[in-house]
UniProtKB/Swiss-Prot annotation:
Its EC number is 3.1.13.-. It comes from Drosophila melanogaster. It is an enzyme of class 3 (hydrolase). The gene is Rat1. One of its GO terms (biological process) is mRNA processing. It holds the Pfam family XRN_M. InterPro entries: 5_3_exoribonuclease (IPR027073), Xrn1_helical (IPR041412), Xrn1_N (IPR004859), Xrn2/3/4 (IPR017151). A 5'-3' exoribonuclease. May promote the termination of transcription by RNA polymerase II and promote RNA degradation. Involved in turnover of piRNA precursors. Residues 409-457, 821-908 are annotated as: Disordered. This is 5'-3' exoribonuclease 2 homolog. The modification Phosphoserine is found at S438. Belongs to the 5'-3' exonuclease family. XRN2/RAT1 subfamily. CDD domains: PIN_XRN1-2-like. It is found in: Nucleus. Keywords: Exonuclease, Hydrolase, Metal-binding, mRNA processing, Nuclease, Nucleus, Phosphoprotein, Transcription, Transcription regulation, Transcription termination, Zinc, Zinc-finger.
Length: 908
């Protein structure tokens, strides 16, 4: 989902959705490497999961070109990094039935336009960054600064190769094939489960291939409605896709969001400064001397669970509509909420100008939605179909508020700019003072020639920083002028005419054109909803504009046809490469085809501009802007490729074919004999329908199958061959349905909701929060003798003075912890990192039974992970729940005050 801010907004508004993953790992004292627990043991997170689905591109990208640590030296190291990441995720989730790995295949045209934009941007940014690095290096070297050697040109990894059809993706598929065999042959936790690999030759985005599998399985009569699903990926659309399944037990696992992660300077590889502030090696770069990152440098990334069952609880409260004149259905309202989120942003359509997630766009739409439901006595969507009459009402109300939305936005932006400008001036003035002191100190050096050299070097570095500071100060006003160069000015009258003239190059007042854009946008909304609920409605439809219309342009949309052409097919992998790659990435396409991207006489040379404009469109950063690239005409593209198909090598022809999913079963599986029999059939075209463990599909023979007791060679140097193989491989296809079949968006019979986490009106003060997944953990109890020991220990720490007590508790920190004087109590938690959410679960009894959350050391009255509940204002007990590991360590603390209330301990 094209909304980077969506997850941050969601985690702030609905914080109890997030919990930290528990891995039960140890660190090897000699090597410093992590030692993870045997995944055959019970899951330390208090729940056993059935199926783990990996959206592999979210793993491949950070493993091949990480932003916060040195990149792998070669492809072999990249593959090993991918293996290690899969192992770690497998160890956290510990699936007991299925592991499904899905790599992005060829995407629908609607998505290809975004992919094309990303890849052209990546090539442009790489070129510009190289030039900027060369310029800065030359400037620093001319001033005598010391620099590390330049990277060799061959060391650069082109991330654009992570696209279906490239040699890299073909090799990745072979390596994953080896990886699955290795784990099923050597790791007991893998031997009893099914593994499905959907590589880049299988059409479809990774997450949507996964959703197609889930959708088709749950439509089968023997599907378990209480299957525990875990989907790994960082895209916000995974949350929407999970909600769209209506499965009661659906969890997302993703990397913990850490803002301000330290990144090394591209010039000197140091931390604490950007490359434009670099002064080379040996000198103290600005802020680096006192650089204290929010996240420790080189810290291992942590994973979190996003519990969609808890999000459903929140949305039940958010979407509640009492006294409706018809029977209320939360499942229908949930589908409508998913649909409304598409207006804020998605990967297929630009967001409406009046809707910004940071401005409460979703809340605004929910308010308009409820008004619509009461008025029309019905919902917006039904299993992927849209009621345009009701959408028209919401768009009309939103359009009436557009003018005020734009004016309010401008006021906030002006206030922010004023504060930001004042902050920058203050920081640079402070910088100037420290630089003068540094320069003065550097001149007070003794007569030794070496010392004079060091002193002169420091003086030169200080002078260089001073010049940069002066230049920065002079550029402040220039930046303001650039930011104010907005020819549309949405906050002023006449913004519509200016918008369409500037963005679409059409004459002011051309109402017919505006209506046409709005109708295409509505068709796009219908296509996206079908994509989420039924699968791809059309492989060749796309929104043919770079910008969205205004909400007020949605007029008379009720009669628009929402049907799409049937029987469309995706591009082949190599054809897609020609549609999304810039000329700078031509090394990844067949050589005869690559000439079409650079030859001035090429009939499609206009598809590959060397330079293009990025319209900031009111944003601050280039990556937020709109890349104004020409849309690819697929008929022209295919026609231009016709003369070159017979020049493809055998390997390239193979990479250009659509493939099948692969199923892997070891001889420890109860279904081994059945699958082995299919794998040994003489005819590869013969397929057999299967049903086991609630999974249905069709299996077929594949040439990739390695004979039982045979040998599979390792494709990676340094890794062992698989000898005496015990794994069987077949092709796997999902159950087939008619093209007109409708997958109903509903709860299945016998589906059981997990224990409720949030309190409701009926629970009152009796509500007992559910920590993590397990609601049946033994409640801790402290006897009277324990209370006496606690009281005595706390009094000893306080030393008889003041009311301050703090501590680490029993399980962590050793003993009772260290007393803190005065009236301050300190819970055992690490607030050194500036999170959007805090995962330490600290529960205190709080008046009113509500919850208090800390965001970046702020307290907000919402339900959250740093949840504190107090029985009254004077209650002093705090219960720390850390290290969620089966029977939980319970750390009791005394916080402030001098009285102990033993009866409150007994409540736990």
């Amino acid at each position: 989902m094209g909304v980077p801010a969506f997850f941050r907004w969601l985690s702030r508004k609905y914080p109890s959705v997030i919990i930290e993953c528990n891995e039960n790992k140890q660190v090897d004292a000699d090597t410093g490497r992590n030692i993870y627990e045997d995944p055959t043991l019970p899951n330390p997170n208090g729940i056993e999961f059935d199926n783990l689905y990996l959206d592999m591109n979210g793993i491949i990208h950070p493993c091949t070109h990480p932003e916060d640590k040195p990149a792998p030296k070669n492809e072999d190291e990249m593959m090993v990094a991918i293996f290690e990441c899969i192992d770690r995720l497998f160890g956290i989730v510990r699936p007991r039935k299925l592991l499904y790995m899905a790599i992005d295949g060829v995407a629908p045209r609607a998505k290809m336009n975004q992919q094309r934009s990303r890849r052209f941007r990546a090539a442009k940014e790489t070129t510009e960054k190289r030039l900027e690095i060369a310029r800065i290096r030359e400037e620093l070297l001319s001033r005598g600064c010391k620099l590390p050697p330049e990277k060799e040109k061959g060391e650069h990894f082109d991330s654009n190769c992570i696209t279906p059809g490239t040699p890299f993706m073909d090799r990745l598929s072979k390596c994953l094939h080896y990886f699955v065999h290795d784990r099923q042959n050597n790791n007991p936790a893998w031997k009893g489960i099914k593994v499905i690999l959907s590589d880049a030759n299988v059409p479809g985005e990774g997450e949507h291939k996964i959703m197609d599998y889930i959708r088709k399985q749950r439509a089968q009569p023997d599907h378990d409605p209480n299957t525990q699903h875990v989907l790994c990926g960082a895209d916000a659309d995974l949350i929407m896709l999970g909600l769209a399944t209506h499965e009661p037990n659906f969890t997302i696992i993703r990397e913990e969001f850490l803002p301000n992660k330290p990144r090394p300077c591209d010039i000197c590889n140091g931390f604490g400064h950007e490359m434009d502030k670099c002064v080379g090696l040996g000198a103290t770069a600005p802020t680096s001397a006192n650089f204290k990152p929010d996240v420790p440098i080189g810290a291992e990334v942590k994973f979190i669970f996003v519990r969609l069952s808890v999000l459903r609880e929140y949305l039940k409260q958010t979407l509640e509509m009492p006294n409706l004149p018809f029977e209320y259905s939360f499942e229908r309202a949930l589908d409508d909420w998913v649909f409304m989120c598409f207006f804020v942003g998605n990967d297929f359509l630009p967001h409406l100008p009046s809707l910004e997630i940071r401005e409460g766009a979703v809340d605004r739409l929910v308010e308009l939605y409820k008004k619509c439901v009461y008025k029309t006595r019905g919902y917006l969507t039904d299993s992927g179909d849209v009621n345009l009459d009701r959408v028209q009402l919401i768009m009309t109300d939103l359009g009436n508020a557009e003018d005020q939305i734009f004016k309010s936005r401008q006021r906030r932006e002006e206030q922010f700019k004023a504060r930001d400008k004042a902050r920058k001036r203050q920081e640079r003035n402070q910088d100037h003072g420290s630089l003068n002191q540094s320069a003065f100190g550097a001149s007070a050096v003794g007569p030794n020639s070496q010392q004079r050299s060091v002193g002169n070097y420091k003086e030169e570095a200080a002078a260089l920083r001073n010049r940069k500071r002066t230049s920065d100060m002079a550029n402040l006003d220039d930046e303001d002028e650039e930011e104010n160069n907005d020819e549309v000015r949405l906050w002023e009258d006449g913004f519509k005419d200016r918008y369409y003239e500037s963005k679409f190059d059409v004459a002011p007042g051309n109402q017919q054109f505006r209506y046409a854009v709005a109708l295409q946008y509505v068709r796009g909304l219908c296509w996206v909803l079908k994509y989420y609920y039924q699968g791809c409605a059309s492989w060749n439809w796309y929104f043919p504009y770079h910008y969205a219309p205004f909400a007020s342009d949605f007029v008379n949309i009720q009669g628009l046809s929402t049907m799409f052409e049937k029987g469309t097919k995706p591009f082949n992998p190599l054809e897609q490469l020609m549609g999304v790659f810039p000329a700078a990435s031509s090394s990844h396409v067949p050589e005869p085809w690559a000439k079409l991207m650079s030859d001035p006489e090429s009939p499609i040379i206009d598809f590959y501009p060397e330079d293009f404009k990025i319209d900031l469109n009111g944003k601050k950063f280039a990556w937020q802007g709109v890349a104004l690239l020409p849309f690819v005409d697929e008929k022209r593209l295919f026609k231009a490729l016709v003369p070159y198909y017979d020049q493809l090598t055998g390997e390239e022809v193979k990479r250009n074919k659509r493939g099948d999913n692969y199923l892997y079963i070891s001889n420890q599986s109860p279904h081994y004999k059945k699958v082995k029999k299919i794998s040994e059939k003489d005819d590869e075209s013969v397929c057999k329908a299967i049903s086991f463990d609630g999974m249905r599909g069709t299996l077929g023979k594949t040439e990739l199958n390695t004979a039982i007791s045979g040998v599979l060679k390792s494709p990676i140097s340094g890794l062992s061959d698989i000898n005496d193989n015990i794994t069987v491989t077949t092709t796997f296809r999902d159950p087939e349905y008619d093209e007109d079949y409708i997958f109903e968006a509903k709860r299945l019979e016998n589906a059981v909701d997990p224990p409720q986490v949030l309190p409701n009106e009926q629970s009152g003060n009796k509500h007992r929060p559910v920590i993590g997944f397990n609601s049946h953990l033994t409640r801790a109890y402290v006897p009277d003798s324990g209370h006496r020991m606690l009281n005595a220990g706390i009094r000893n720490q306080q030393g008889g003075g003041g009311n301050g007590g703090g501590g680490g508790g029993y399980g962590q920190g050793g003993g009772y912890g260290q007393g803190i004087g005065g009236n301050q109590g300190q819970s055992y938690q690490n607030n050194s990192r500036n999170y959007n959410y805090n995962y330490n679960n600290n529960y205190n009894q709080h008046q009113g039974g509500g919850y208090q959350n800390n965001y970046n050391n702020r307290q907000q009255q919402q339900y959250g992970h740093n949840q504190r509940f107090n029985q009254d204002n004077s209650n002093q007990q705090q219960r720390n729940f850390n290290n969620y590991n089966g029977p939980r360590n319970n750390n009791y603390q005394q916080q402030g005050g001098s009285r102990q209330q033993n009866q409150n301990y007994r409540r736990f």
